[in-house]
């Protein structure tokens, strides 16, 4: 745990640090976020973490408009740095593909046909609000917080706030709207950083055959740029 003298900072994430950050992601969400559970299958197992880390590494290496950040704590000179949080901010000028198989190796990640179909339908609805925001930007684009996770042992210490404000500052500098599909648990944090709910509960039409599965509870939140 942190000591009173510890400070939280934000820095760019290296490829080598992605496995550590994926463990933070898994511990942060546990099994309380259905979208995370489906998007990163078995994320709390060694095989799931290996696969998730591999996917994040490919994302980081191929998406030039995505910035991977870490929140770190370091008590003083010579003390070991601890990664306690992770965030991914993306400058998005083109609408994301509505078809999951255009952004993921779907057969490898979701070998079960029902899981794949369920995730495909979730994804199709998930990208609708940000797609509309991009269309409404008249070519400027938006700044999207695609992932935010803070280790449960280091929450309420400012890591989440620092990671969010890094992106809202970058959005302001570009004159762009910032958006996030946030969980209800994180709502207060986002509101403290200036984001406001535009859609109180995002809609996921997954069909009658998946009525027994947990659907995500996500709030679509936005923040206008401050000049």
Regions found by a protein language model. Name each.
Residues 130-138, 162-177:
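Conserved acyl-CoA
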Residues 150, 156-169, 192:
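Conserved acetyl-CoA-binding loop-helix of GNAT-fold acetyltransferases
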């Amino acid at each position: 745990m942190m000591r009173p003298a510890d400070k939280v900072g934000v820095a760019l994430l290296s490829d080598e640090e992605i496995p550590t950050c994926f463990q933070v992601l898994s511990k942060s969400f546990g099994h309380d976020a259905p979208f995370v559970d489906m998007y990163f299958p078995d994320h709390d197992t060694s095989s799931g973490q290996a696969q998730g880390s591999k996917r994040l590494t490919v994302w980081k290496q191929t998406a030039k408009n995505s910035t991977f950040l870490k929140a770190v704590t370091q008590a003083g000179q010579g003390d070991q740095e601890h990664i306690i949080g992770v965030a991914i901010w993306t400058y998005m000028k083109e609408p994301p593909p509505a078809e999951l198989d255009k952004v993921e190796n779907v057969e490898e990640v979701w070998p079960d046909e029902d899981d794949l179909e369920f995730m495909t339908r979730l994804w199709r609805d998930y990208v609708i609000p940000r797609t509309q925001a991009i269309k409404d930007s008249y070519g400027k684009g938006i700044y999207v917080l695609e992932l935010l996770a803070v280790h449960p042992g280091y929450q309420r210490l400012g890591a989440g706030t620092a990671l969010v404000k890094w992106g809202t500052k970058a959005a302001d500098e570009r004159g762009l709207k910032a958006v996030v599909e946030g969980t209800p648990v994180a709502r207060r944090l986002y509101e403290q950083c200036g984001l406001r709910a535009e859609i109180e509960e995002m809609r996921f039409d997954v069909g009658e055959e998946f009525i027994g599965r947990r659907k995500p509870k996500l709030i679509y939140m936005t923040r206008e740029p401050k000049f």
